[in-house]
């Protein structure tokens, strides 16, 4: 079912927007259409999958970074699921050799080769669009300056764009719902199940306490204002897939990286006491991870020069403070369907704003959502006409 949808939908992401009816006809499978585009995903999964753990693993693609139940009527979980399963037309995920730094470096090199001037340590203060283009006010070490352009492509969240335009914020602010951990390990931990080697277990996505019932309990606890007692989380060991992300000395020492992504950690849980809530969420998440290990993960964490554990933890509020992603929402806002929801949007690129000279090129665009690069390409196509 998902492969049918992926094969039909993925190629359209880099084309002008189709209407809902056109995309439905393109998919050509009414059962698949209803399951993902019309019925709450939880209902579909419950009907098709009898095992609680298997159902939960499927649902994580719908709930990661999205604070919702599997049966939410607004279908935000369905939209999140859709973008996770259509990648490459197959749903397969890939990581760049050399890590995201290699991607950034390649983008920089291409931009400079094309004659671009890149400014760092620079804060954009405001945008002033008019019928001839747009002005951009910014500050750097030399004070406040401004430039004009025929088109301005904005990689910030839509809510941040509204602020830069001097417009009133929307009533419904985005809210992120994740806890992100990055750990540097001296080695991978042993599992409770001794028949599975750590290298095999951590080579893909490692799901921890993510059964369907566990996901629902965690949501209910978070919705009631409490950090989940046993947070659902999943891990990715990117250094197993691509050892080049570590330096030669760390590779020789057998070190590994471990990224842990915790679900159902909405920004509201951190508002009253950001530091205390972050510490509590970290402790709860490590306990959750330890529950499937034969040894505490803390014993495998490397230490810095002053003995501090090599653990980076970021709550939604940390993400907002450091990157100005409103509410710490990893998708900049709730994901949108990959089709035009109004007739006048058909044929657009999904990057347009109320100002012709200003386009979105980041995750908050229609068909956005993160590191795909699709919004940037579509914004470029909109400029090229």
Residue ranges and their predicted role:
Residues 55-71, 228-236, 295-366:
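A glycine-rich dinucleotide-binding beta-alpha-beta segment and adjacent secondary-structure elements
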Residues 74-81, 253-262, 354:
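Short coil-to-beta-strand
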Residues 96, 122-250:
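Mid-domain catalytic core of redox enzymes
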Residues 110-124:
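A conserved beta-strand/loop element that lines the FAD pocket in flavoprotein oxidoreductases
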Residues 153, 183, 260, 289, ...:
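Hydrophobic, well-ordered secondary-structure elements that form the walls
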Residues 234-335:
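FAD-dependent oxidoreductase catalytic-site/capping-region signature
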Residues 361-384:
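A conserved FAD-binding loop/helix module that cradles the flavin
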Residues 3-114, 322-326, 331, 339:
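Active-site/ligand-binding neighborhood in enzyme catalytic cores
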């Amino acid at each position: 079912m998902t492969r049918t949808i992926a094969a039909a939908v993925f190629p359209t992401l880099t084309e002008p927007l189709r209407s809902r009816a056109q995309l439905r006809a393109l998919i050509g499978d009414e059962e698949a259409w209803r399951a993902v585009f019309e019925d709450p995903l939880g209902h579909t999964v419950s009907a098709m999958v009898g095992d609680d753990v298997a159902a939960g693993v499927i649902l994580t693609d719908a709930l990661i970074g999205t604070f919702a139940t599997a049966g939410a009527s607004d279908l935000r979980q369905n939209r999140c699921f859709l973008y996770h399963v259509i990648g490459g037309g197959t749903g397969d995920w890939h990581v760049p050799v050399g890590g995201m730094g290699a991607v950034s470096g390649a983008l920089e090199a291409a931009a400079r080769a094309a004659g671009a001037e890149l400014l760092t340590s620079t804060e954009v203060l405001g945008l002033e669009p008019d019928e001839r283009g747009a002005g951009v006010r910014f500050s750097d070490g030399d004070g406040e300056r401004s430039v004009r352009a025929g088109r301005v492509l904005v990689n910030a969240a839509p809510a941040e764009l509204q602020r830069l335009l001097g417009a009133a914020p929307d009533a419904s602010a985005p809210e992120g719902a994740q806890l992100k951990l990055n750990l540097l390990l001296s080695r991978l931990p042993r599992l409770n199940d001794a028949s599975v080697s750590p290298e095999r277990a951590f080579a893909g996505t490692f799901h921890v306490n993510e059964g369907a019932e566990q996901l629902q309990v965690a949501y209910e606890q978070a919705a009631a204002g409490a950090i989940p007692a046993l947070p659902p989380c999943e891990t990715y060991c990117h250094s197993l897939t691509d050892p080049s992300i570590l330096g030669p000395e760390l590779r020789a020492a057998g070190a590994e990286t471990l990224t842990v992504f915790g679900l159902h950690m909405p920004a509201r849980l951190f508002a009253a006491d950001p530091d205390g809530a972050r510490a509590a969420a970290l402790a709860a998440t490590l306990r959750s991870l330890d529950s499937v290990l034969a040894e505490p993960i803390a014993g495998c964490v490397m230490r810095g020069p002053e003995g501090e554990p090599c653990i980076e933890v970021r709550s939604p509020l940390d993400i907002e403070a450091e990157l100005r992603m409103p509410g710490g929402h990893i998708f900049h806002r709730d994901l949108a369907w990959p089709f035009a929801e109004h007739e006048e949007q058909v044929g657009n690129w999904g990057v347009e704003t109320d100002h012709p000279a200003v386009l979105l090129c980041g995750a908050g665009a229609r068909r956005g959502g993160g590191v795909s690069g699709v919004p940037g390409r579509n914004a470029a196509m909109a400029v090229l006409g």
